[in-house]
Amino acid sequence: TLLGDGLDGAESVATLYRLAIAATAAYSDGLLSGATDLTARHVSERHQFGKPLATFQAVAQQIADVYVTARTLHVAALSSVWRVSRGLDADDDLDVTAYWIAAELPPAMRVLHHLHGGIGVDATYPLHRYSSTAKDLARWLGGASYRLDLVGARCSSI
């Protein structure tokens, strides 16, 4: 069988679902990391009022907020993928990670766009691909409200 011996149809679908969410988590982690690196380079090289943008307090604060989102996503993705890879119960981790992706990844990308100014929305600029992929992933996961409902249902059934 595709997903292992001894699995019935429902178990196979559940396993495939867990693998898909884990893969999305890992992909989202790399996506935000790449977009953050691109933005960090941009604000270090772009000058305004004779100084790099990165030296302005408001820019540093916004990058710091995105960094917190990125680190949280990284830890959540790592935990989810590790639990799935070990065959452990990963459903809680996967639900929380999927919620974090749907709720926090698109706003983080908006901040990174803001820090790029007008260049970030140019379809030929790399940030555009990062951002459009982030939006697609959030939609693929069902959006933040749907994911929060799943997390809430899981918590209320404890």
What is each stretch, according to the model?
Residues 1-19:
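A short, charged helix-loop
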Residues 18-158:
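Alpha-helical interface subdomain recognition
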